[in-house]
Amino acid sequence: MTNTRKTHPLIKIINHSFIDLPAPSNISAWWNFGSLLGLCLIIQILTGLFLAMHYTSDTMTAFSSVTHICRDVNYGWLIRYMHANGASMFFICLFLHVGRGMYYGSYTYFETWNIGVILLFAVMATAFMGYVLPWGQMSFWGATVITNLLSAIPYIGTTLVEWIWGGFSVDKATLTRFFAFHFILPFIIAALVMVHLLFLHETGSNNPSGLISDSDKIPFHPYYTIKDILGVLLLVLTLMALVLFSPDLLGDPDNYTPANPLSTPPHIKPEWYFLFAYAILRSIPNKLGGVLALVFSILILMLFPLLHLSKQRSMMFRPLSQCVFWILVADLFTLTWIGGQPVEHPFIIIGQLASILYFAIILLILPTVSMIENKLLKW
């Protein structure tokens, strides 16, 4: 008698993806983040669904409805803060997942990698629109500043911005459409995740050595299911510690003031996970140049497969490239710090140097160092 798990048309797909999937025997904890991102997405969709049951997307009542959720709804405060801090956990996992891909050369699976970059854009768009929904000061002014960037597009810019706003400023129409998009995008993300996995399972997973591991595979279950459960426990522990002990740690106090179009907050800044891109945007004095730098700071990830000049896939045995990689990580931390600082000396020049270094490392230094390593190894 054949096993239902292997013959049933629907269960068979799940079996090939999560149970009998042949996985390399040596993948480290850095490979846990895919499943953790899946968990984050599920948490966000579920908490978001319950929040949407009580939220009203109207400028007059949006702020009050969030207050109502926190004060009057059973465990509403828990759902709201799980959703807000869940986004932070989502981005921590995302950045680590992308960093893993860069370090171990996973970008050579370029279909999987490019879908991943599109997913990153989609998650960033969703998070941005979600930040607008509570209709606090930072929600309103963040939406105004970021949507206004589109006016830098030649010829159609101004029309485009007014079209997105649904009027001549960020108002009721903007909030309503942002809520609609914020609701639908996670489901589009879930569909893209399926495509991401489809492409990944065409080739199989990469591993820390970067070598082909076809001759040494082990079943995903029980080995990596158990390993993933450990990651899940650590993620949930961190998230709940954040939610229950300091839920506002990563938020902005300005967002507890209802949106007021007549008073600008002293420092307009996005959530922490956008600060690196915000710093790159601000480091260029020209509006269009800044917008292009902002978009290209993420889009540049798509160039990684083309810029890979090393004869080795992974950085595991490339100490020079490792050095450059960790300088890039330090540079991103610097950009994140600068993004949260006011636009004044010395932060302006530090931001400009960090932005130049970011693009220089990816476009110039890493490929050059890769070629030097090839030469040193007489390849």
Swiss-Prot record:
Heme b b566 binds at H97, H196. It comes from the Eukaryota. One of its GO terms (biological process) is mitochondrial electron transport, ubiquinol to cytochrome c. The keyword Cell membrane does not apply. A ubiquinone binds at H201. Keywords: Electron transport, Heme, Iron, Membrane, Metal-binding, Mitochondrion, Mitochondrion inner membrane, Respiratory chain, Transmembrane, Transmembrane helix, Transport, Ubiquinone. InterPro entries: Cyt_b/b6_C, Cyt_b/b6_C_sf, Cyt_b/b6_N, Cytb/b6-like_sf, Cytochrome_b, Cytochrome_b_C_euk/bac, Cytochrome_b_N_euk/bac, Di-haem_cyt_TM. Binds 2 heme b groups non-covalently. Heme b b562 binds at H83, H182. One of its GO terms (molecular function) is metal ion binding. It is a multi-pass membrane protein. Its cofactor is heme b. The chain crosses the membrane at residues 33-53, 77-98, 113-133, 178-198, 226-246, 288-308, 320-340, 347-367. GO terms for cellular component: mitochondrial inner membrane; respiratory chain complex III. Pfam families: Cytochrom_B_C (PF00032), Cytochrome_B (PF00033). PROSITE patterns: CYTB_CTER, CYTB_NTER. It is found in: Mitochondrion inner membrane. CDD domains: cytochrome_b_C (cd00290), Cytochrome_b_N (cd00284). Component of the ubiquinol-cytochrome c reductase complex (complex III or cytochrome b-c1 complex) that is part of the mitochondrial respiratory chain. The b-c1 complex mediates electron transfer from ubiquinol to cytochrome c. Contributes to the generation of a proton gradient across the mitochondrial membrane that is then used for ATP synthesis. PANTHER family: CYTOCHROME B. Heme 1 (or BL or b562) is low-potential and absorbs at about 562 nm, and heme 2 (or BH or b566) is high-potential and absorbs at about 566 nm. Belongs to the cytochrome b family. This is Cytochrome b.
